[in-house]
Amino acid sequence: LKRLSACMKTKLLTTTLFWLCVTAVAQSGQPHRKPFVTSEPMVHDPVMAYEDSTYYLFCTGIGIQQMTSRDRKTWTVLPEPIMTVMPQWTGDSVPGFTHHVWAPDVIRWHGRWWLAYSCSTFGKNGSAIGLLSKPSLGFPVWNDEGCIVTSREGRDRWNAIDPNFIIDDNDQAWMTWGSFWDGIQMVRLDTTMHVAKGERPRTIARRYASRDRNVPANPTSKYAGTNAIEAPFIFRHDGWYYLFVSWDYCCRGAQSNYRVAVGRSRQVDGPYLDRSGKDMRDGGGTLFLEGDKKQFEAVGHCAAYHVNGEDIFICHGYSIAHQGASILVQRPIRWTADGWPFLKTID
């Protein structure tokens, strides 16, 4: 992808060492390294865009990491992040923010590319979602569009991270976001991709119903609670809006138990129901994908796209062969006769 708060993401655990090697030159002022090509890119929280026969991948990392591909089989990892210098407002809004940017999302709307990103510190909900834009992905410079939304400890019961843009059937822009606390939030946006006047966030999904008390303890944070849901992504298909979310815990390498669930609605702002008819605000969600324990221990933080006549699902997976490092997972989406998405296998 996500959000009016800060969140539950130890993005620093499995991918940081890799990305610090790639981007250390951007921090040190030394000459930039050359791009390199890989068929198995290490990513966290990947999102994708397509323009002029080129795929672009953006993911968590110092200043937002980026790579390109012509075929989605081999990827050129670019040595420079999107932002080598973070906007001043990010440090002012999020004390302790270290420029390790989480969970971007990107979309084209009204002739521009818009990229949202998360600024936070692990396990707390003092967070912010920033915005960049430019006319073309090939254009060299992203324009700083400021902050979309912030969350504050003690003020908000949601976390402003993991943004996801969705444009509805009436060409209206919306944004979802969220991680733990009171779950997945949503607001309507104006034409500048900021929160529309008078809009207030509404909860559209929780891991558990708010009335539930018998839920597993949170092993990663004493602040965020047990509502282990995050990383929303809404995908339009055949008159439905499909809300994908990630359940449980990321960012612990081979100890992660992340997995993906889905629900759907005829209306962009819900209610989203799972295949059994349970509202996702009450803990509903149909399991869509989890680790197969052969190739991946766990999978999550997904995105879905319709590109070149194909529906594509991407996420990161904690690779068993790579000792729990997170790598890119890509699969074609299939559809049941009654309109539910599925993947045949993960391998």
Task: Kindly label every feature range from the protein language model.
Residues 2-14:
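Bacterial N-terminal signal peptides that target proteins for export
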Residues 5, 21-24, 36:
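Detector for intrinsically disordered, low-structure N-terminal pre-sequences
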Residues 9, 25-26:
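Enriched but not universal
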Residues 12-23:
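Sec-dependent N-terminal signal peptides
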Residues 27-347:
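Carbohydrate-active catalytic/glycan-binding domains of CAZyme proteins
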